[in-house]
C-alpha cells in the first residue's frame, strides 16, 4: 500500500462538478493499493498516518499528529500511484490491484483510519475526480507498508 500524504489547510474533492468530500484542515491522502496488499497493510498505514507527528507545536517543531490538532482526513483512491514508468512512454499499471479488490481494501483502510478517532471524508472510488487543496508547508510524504 502506498499513500501520498499532504498536510492541508483545506481540501475538497468533486465528481461531475459536485463536491463529494471536503475537510477544513488536516491530511489529504492519495491512496494506492497493489494486488499484494492485505488488511494488515491497511491497518499499519492507518495507524502510522494517524500518529505521524507532522504538525508544528508552539516552537515550530513537528511534534503533533493529526489527532493532536483535531484535524480531519480527505482520502482519495488513486491507482496511478502504482504506475511503472521505467519502460516506454506510457505508464504500466500492472502493479495496481484489480478494482474489486482495491475498492474493498480502500473501504477497509478508511474504516481503520476512522477507528483511530479521525473524521474521514472520501472521494468516489473509480471516478474521475477534481481534487483541490491548499498544501500546508508544503509537507508531503510517501507512506508505504512494504
From Swiss-Prot:
Subcellular location: Cytoplasm
InterPro entries assigned to the protein according to its UniProt record, in alphabetical order: Daa-tRNA_deacyls_DTD, DTD-like_sf
Annotated keywords: Cytoplasm, Hydrolase, RNA-binding, tRNA-binding
Quaternary structure (record): Homodimer.
Main function: An aminoacyl-tRNA editing enzyme that deacylates mischarged D-aminoacyl-tRNAs. Also deacylates mischarged glycyl-tRNA(Ala), protecting cells against glycine mischarging by AlaRS. Acts via tRNA-based rather than protein-based catalysis; rejects L-amino acids rather than detecting D-amino acids in the active site. By recycling D-aminoacyl-tRNA to D-amino acids and free tRNA molecules, this enzyme counteracts the toxicity associated with the formation of D-aminoacyl-tRNA entities in vivo and helps enforce protein L-homochirality.
Superkingdom of the organism of origin: Bacteria
Membership in a protein family: Belongs to the DTD family.
Motif (Gly-cisPro motif, important for rejection of L-amino acids): 137-138
Record-given protein name: D-aminoacyl-tRNA deacylase
Xref: HAMAP family: Deacylase_Dtd
CDD domains: Dtyr_deacylase
Single annotated GO MF: D-tyrosyl-tRNA(Tyr) deacylase activity
Originating organism: Bacillus cereus (strain B4264)
Domains (record comment): A Gly-cisPro motif from one monomer fits into the active site of the other monomer to allow specific chiral rejection of L-amino acids.
Amino acid at each position: 500500500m502506498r499513500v501520498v500524504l499532504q498536510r492541508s489547510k483545506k481540501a475538497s474533492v468533486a465528481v461531475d462538478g459536485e463536491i463529494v468530500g471536503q475537510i477544513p484542515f488536516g491530511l489529504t491522502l492519495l491512496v494506492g493499493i497493489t494486488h499484494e496488499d492485505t488488511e494488515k497493510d491497511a491497518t499499519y498505514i492507518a495507524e502510522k498516518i494517524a500518529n505521524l507527528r507532522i504538525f508544528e507545536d508552539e516552537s515550530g517543531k513537528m511534534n503533533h499528529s493529526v489527532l493532536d490538532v483535531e484535524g480531519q482526513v480527505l482520502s482519495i483512491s488513486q491507482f496511478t500511484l502504482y504506475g511503472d514508468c521505467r519502460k516506454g512512454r506510457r505508464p504500466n499499471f500492472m502493479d495496481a490491484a484489480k478494482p474489486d479488490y482495491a475498492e474493498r481494501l480502500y473501504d477497509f483502510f478508511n474504516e481503520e483510519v476512522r477507528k483511530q478517532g479521525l473524521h474521514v471524508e472520501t472521494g468516489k472510488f473509480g471516478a474521475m475526480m477534481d481534487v483541490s487543496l491548499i498544501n500546508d508547508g508544503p509537507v508531503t510524504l510517501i507512506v508505504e507498508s512494504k
